[in-house]
Every structure is written in C-alpha cells, then in structure tokens.
Amino acid sequence: MAAKASFNWIDPLLLDQQLTEEERMVRDSAEQFAADKLAPRVLEAFRHEKTDPAIFREMGETGLLGATIPEAYGGSGLNYVCYGLIAREVERIDSGYRSMMSVQSSLVMVPINEFGSEATKQKYLSLIHI
C-alpha cells in the first residue's frame, strides 16, 4: 500500500515551487511590509473609523503601488504574478487597503500606462505611485 501524501497547510496549492526567485523576494517584501507597517495600524484605523493615507505613500515608496508599471515611469516593472503576490499579502491583513491598492494600481495606473500618450504617462505615472 502506498503511503499517504502529506498536506501542506502553509502552501496547499504548492505555489511556492512555481515561483521564480524574484517573485519569492517580492512576496517576502510584501509580507514583511504588511506585517510590520500595515497590521499594527489597521486595528487603530478601525477603532477610529479612518484610513491612514500615509500607508499609501509608504506602499509607493516600497514599490508596492504600480508594481507592473515600467521603472521609467516610477513603477517597479514587475510581472503580474508579482502583483498578485503583493495583493495577496496586503489582503491577508486587510481587504480594504488591498482594494484601495488595487484601484490605484490597476484601475488608475494601468490604463494610463497602456493607453495614455507619452506626455500623459510622464505627467501622471511618476506622481501617482507615491
């Protein structure tokens, strides 16, 4: 009789082994940011029913906003796997901040990058990630 395979509770879909080294580094950085910078402030924000805008400046400075935007426009130039990993780590702490991050990164920055003129990209993309 064959031995039963063990279930990996930390990585049930075995995604980690499919990631590149860069993707793991991005995930780990996002996890660290979420644990160190986001988590301690979320409870306080809930208690006072407010959002801390400084978190978004810090996300931009860390390269978590506009992750797929080319570096030439102030983004991180990462792939969409990295973007998904960043979103997952922020979501793990708070879905509201992840939603705001996604709106800024995907619904605002991506259309400007994909469809904006060079002048529009130069004018806005380097500003909105911080």
Protein language model features and the residues they cover:
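Intrinsic disorder at enzyme termini
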Residues: 1-22
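Short, flexible segments with low predicted structural confidence
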Residues: 2-6, 27-32
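Glycine-rich flavin
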Residues: 25, 32, 37-128
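Polar low-complexity intrinsically disordered regions
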Residues: 1, 128-130
